[in-house]
Amino acid sequence: MDYSIATLLSYFVDDKLVAGKFLEKKLGCESPEAIEALQIALDALEKMGVLVKERGKYNRVTREDVVEARLRCSSKGFCFAIQDDEDATDIYVREGNLSNAWNGDRVLVKVIKDGTRRKSPEEQVHLILDRANPSLLAQVKKSEDNYRAVPLDDRLLFELELQDKEQNLGEAVDHLVHVSVLRYPIAQHPPLGEVTKVLGSDAEAAADTDIVSCKHDLPLGWTPEAIEALQSLPKVIEPGELKKRTWITAKLQLVTFGDGPRGETLPWQEVALSLESQANQWQVGIHITDIAHYIAEDSLLDQLARKRGTTVYLEEQICPLFPEGLIGRCSLIPDEDRLALSFFLTVDDRGEVTGFEYHSSVVKVDHQLDFSEVQTALADIESVSGELKPYGGLLQELFFQICPLIKSQRLQRGSFNLQTETASPRLDEGRLGVIMTQETLPIRSLLAELMVVLQREVALQLQALGIPGLYCGQVAPEGEDLTDIVKLAGNLDLGVKIDLEGDIIPQHYHHLSQGFESLPAKAVLNHLLANTLKIEKYFSHPAPHFALAYDSGYTHCVSPAQRYGDLVIQRLLKLVLTEGRDRRTKQMKTGVELNAHTCRNQISWNVLPPNLQETIEGDLHQLVLGLNDREQTAEDAEKDLLGLKKAEKMKARAGEIFRGLITGVQSYGFFVQIFDLLAEGLVHVSSLKDDWYEFRSRQCALVGRKSRTSYRLGNEVDVQVRSVDYYRQQIDLGAVNNAPKDSANMDFDDDDEDGDEREEQDTMDWDAMEDGDDDEGGAVIF
């Protein structure tokens, strides 16, 4: 099993000694060669002062002059070490101190020279923990005696030698290729790579999904060993397993929801719902397929899923967490017995959850419902007929009463919604952490309300049991993240006041999104607001969740076939049922119900055996960092594909004129978000030939000296598509001469104290642009 230094070091937690044998087991070192390689790594880390050996075991050394961070480099070679702590200062690392580290690598950075009043401390990459670029996109070129690959990512300032074994690289010269890194640079030896796929003559000739999957190193296929492991899984449910579980098939209607043509069985049906009306309350059943039963911990399929972390959606192409063959065994399809974990929420007539319990179960789904079909039926619930008629009561109570009540509770707590035109593949709040509503399909977001409140209850149950958990949180945005959109809201006279020096709270987003509702540009504004949110992160402890307005205690559990973290939670919940102690001592006649809310505040003992609890804590600590990295990669890849799609559409419409909203103004030009496609481009100041334009930072505007014509944040303008850089997703726009003359409404007199400095800075920026600094040469599409 391959592993990084970061993975190895993640097993050193809480200043505890770790035996070499323990690491061999955890890292899958079975052969003599693998054990020897591990020992070499341990010896090297000991010599570097990262580990210390005590009584035959190892411990991690904590040093104040060494910090862990991820490298972020620019195309000019400037590199900063970005620490995981949001409040930590970024560390500048000179090019000569990178120690062969590349952009994106996780590293240990060490202070090699203390700072003075005039100079910052000098830092050096002490150790590369994890490589971020196991493969890359490049262009092949022929040198005197071999072939080389030039990375397309201009932040990777090197060339790779190409291995020319049984490959006709001459045919690939000047073509876009996917290169697998065989050897990273070491001493005088340059990096070595191997061409694994020729994508096309250039980026535009290649398939966009190929570009994205190769760029982000997404695994699309499965090894023969993985397929063999899949085939060895049981194809039928063992009779003994059925006897251990609660049957949820006789008394309740079970339905699943999905997107697809009527009558078509949809893959990966992970969740089924049931509903039972009671006096002044409901019992809502949420039944989740039991992936944990089939995927044993540390099995080959589990290791591969852990490495993938999450399913990545590239439109029709999906990079799944598990092989497709698992669908037939686990998916909750109609009229088939399936193993599940069944959760029951008691919801009162105010939308508050008053009861929670869960069971290992067997379920049989009665019917699969299509979102669009249900939305149409709910518009005229009295006339529901055909196959939907038996479920009319369930749908009416679920979407007209229960989910709206739960939503009301969430909004009263301080949470908010944002509108979107595209549906998320997730049933819950998704990676951005906010419930997105669709005007055409509002039941999707209503169903998400139910998933969110279930996941909150699961987190509360884990905390009440005192067992380790994998929690989901979201960091609040910084004031500077909202600067432009708050100024934009002010220019649009929305009347929303936000103190950017203070804490940003969810109510700020609620007020902004509510203010956008009445504006023609609301789609653009909601899109911009969503882009200010940080994606969710995993934690090994309860953490606040910004968009959902939870102080602490939230997790994910409804998608164990699509997110590895959900599978981990499923295993923990099942472990409670099989290994949990429901009473302090065996002498006690009665115990608590560990699977129900009634045990909360009743437990004063260790529910799990201490050794097991300690092992789980260590595993979760090791897991968190990897899962967060994979979620970020998935988010980047999905955004990348969307950006390529938009760039392709805009390139095909070069020369056309579009209406858009000015969303940012700088000294070098202004950014325009085009209404039709939500694509953003840059109108460079050099393209404004009718006047000399000056940047006014206070008004967020570019103002013509003679004409007083202004391009101001929040103005609507017509722009023409001049050119598009497809791979970099940069759109160059030109302004059509229809900008408003705002001199009557705004004070554009040259009375700023920093006027001369501003004008000089404008000139400097422009000079830098002409000298070839293309960092501002176009807008990256978000």
UniProtKB/Swiss-Prot annotation:
The keyword Nuclease applies. InterPro entries: CSD, CSD2, NA-bd_OB-fold, RNase_B_OB_dom, RNase_II/R, RNase_II/R_CS, RNR_Ribonuclease, S1_domain. It comes from the Bacteria. Keywords: Exonuclease, Hydrolase, Nuclease. Residues 655-736 form the S1 motif domain. Residues 737-782 are annotated as: Disordered. SUPFAM superfamilies: Nucleic acid-binding proteins. Residues 270-579 form the RNB domain. GO terms for molecular function: exonuclease activity; RNA binding; RNA nuclease activity. Residues 747-782 have a biased composition (Acidic residues). SMART domains: CSP, RNB, S1. The keyword Hydrolase applies. Belongs to the RNR ribonuclease family. Not known; control resistance to the carbonic anhydrase inhibitor acetazolamide. This is Acetazolamide conferring resistance protein zam. It comes from Synechocystis sp. (strain ATCC 27184 / PCC 6803 / Kazusa).
